[in-house]
């Protein structure tokens, strides 16, 4: 259940838990600049996988913040929970 959606113009007014603040800020910048991001993502079923994603939107739902993104590994749109992103790197590639 989505409780909020990222709006680039209101980024400064968003409160984010300290544990995911860096991840949130990198994703917000990537969304604004249409840049790809490299993440290590933890899945309960598959453990950690490394993925390149094209992030489109940040959203708040019942269990926390998420990002809607195109996953280059799965070739599909996916939702990723920010609390499950272990490592993140902003790339110099655009989408």
What are these regions (language model features)?
Residues 1-95:
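Short glycine- and basic-residue-enriched patches
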């Amino acid at each position: 259940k989505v409780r909020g959606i990222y709006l680039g113009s209101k980024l400064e007014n968003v409160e984010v838990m300290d544990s995911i603040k860096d991840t949130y800020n990198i994703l917000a910048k990537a969304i604004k600049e249409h840049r790809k991001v490299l993440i290590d993502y933890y899945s309960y079923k598959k453990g950690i996988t490394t993925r390149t994603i094209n992030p489109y939107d940040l959203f708040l739902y019942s269990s926390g913040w998420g990002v809607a993104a195109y996953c280059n590994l799965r070739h599909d749109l996916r939702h990723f929970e920010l609390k499950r992103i272990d490592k993140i790197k902003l790339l110099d590639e655009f989408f």
